Amino acid sequence: MAHKKGLGSTRNGRDSQAKRLGVKRYEGQVVRAGNILVRQRGTRFKPGKNVGMGRDFTLFALVDGVVEFQDRGRLGRYVHVRPLA
């Protein structure tokens, strides 16, 4: 006779890959045009001066310069790139 009952399989045991979202370049860092500044879902950060936004809401530098963050309260948080003089 069997010593164990037949066991059903569990419906757990899956997880999705981490998406590596977040801020990639911080305030005061020097960046080149095209550098990714923030990877995000939706507009947690909005593009400011000299910053572009991709279809997936990725923010990137349009010019060489220094990264700046600005919190405008209910208007949202903005990322700017101040051009190198």
Swiss-Prot record:
The record describes its quaternary structure and partners as: Part of the 50S ribosomal subunit.
Please state which protein family the record places this protein in.
Belongs to the bacterial ribosomal protein bL27 family.
Recorded hits in InterPro entries, A to Z, give:
Ribosomal_bL27, Ribosomal_bL27_CS
This protein is called Large ribosomal subunit protein bL27
Q: Which GO terms describe its biological process?
A: translation
Q: Which UniProt keywords apply?
A: Ribonucleoprotein, Ribosomal protein
Q: Which Pfam families match?
A: Ribosomal_L27
Which GO molecular function annotations are given, in alphabetical order? Answer: structural constituent of ribosome
Assigned GO CC terms: cytosolic large ribosomal subunit
Per UniProt, what is the name of the gene that codes for the protein in this document? rpmA
Q: What does this protein do?
A: Found on the solvent side of the large subunit.
Upper taxonomic lineage: Bacteria, Thermotogati, Deinococcota, Deinococci, Thermales
Where is region (Disordered) located? Answer: 1-21
Quote the PANTHER family the UniProt record gives. LARGE RIBOSOMAL SUBUNIT PROTEIN BL27M, RIBOSOMAL PROTEIN L27
